[in-house]
Amino acid sequence: MTRTDTRAGVGALGEQLAVDYLQGLGLRVLARNWRCRYGELDVVVADDAVQAVVFVEVKTRTTDRFGGVAEAVTPVKVRRLRRLAGLWLSEQDARWESVRLDVVTVRIGQGRSPELTHIEGVG
């Protein structure tokens, strides 16, 4: 198994843990790994309680070597997510009262339970 395969596996595990967590909050998954020429949206969910669509960036970490939660999503990344969200919305027939960008960070490592942090409204 290559380092790339390992990273992809860790990322996929983190994303699944994030989706399970979001569904546990009562959010409904609309899309996963939506791609276009400008990038990818990790997870798109509906918060039916407030008629909102939420675009969720999932960051999975095995160490803090590349920064923690605060460094997970930069202003440049937020701008890119906004653009992608707009493109995704333009393809939808449904309309929502509000739109939100969230981040879920997942820390996983050997011998410990995964730790999830959910930051709502990052941009």
UniProtKB/Swiss-Prot annotation:
Tell me which Pfam families the record gives. Answer: UPF0102
CDD domains of this UniProt entry? PoNe_Nuclease
Q: What Gene Ontology molecular-function terms does this entry list?
A: nucleic acid binding
Tell me where on the tree of life, at the top rank, the source sits: Bacteria
Q: Which InterPro entries match?
A: Restrct_endonuc-II-like (IPR011335), tRNA_endonuc-like_dom_sf (IPR011856), UPF0102_YraN-like (IPR003509)
The entry's family comment says:
Belongs to the UPF0102 family.
Q: Which PANTHER family match?
A: UPF0102 PROTEIN YRAN
Q: What is this protein called?
A: UPF0102 protein Mflv_4140
What is the source species?
Mycolicibacterium gilvum (strain PYR-GCK)
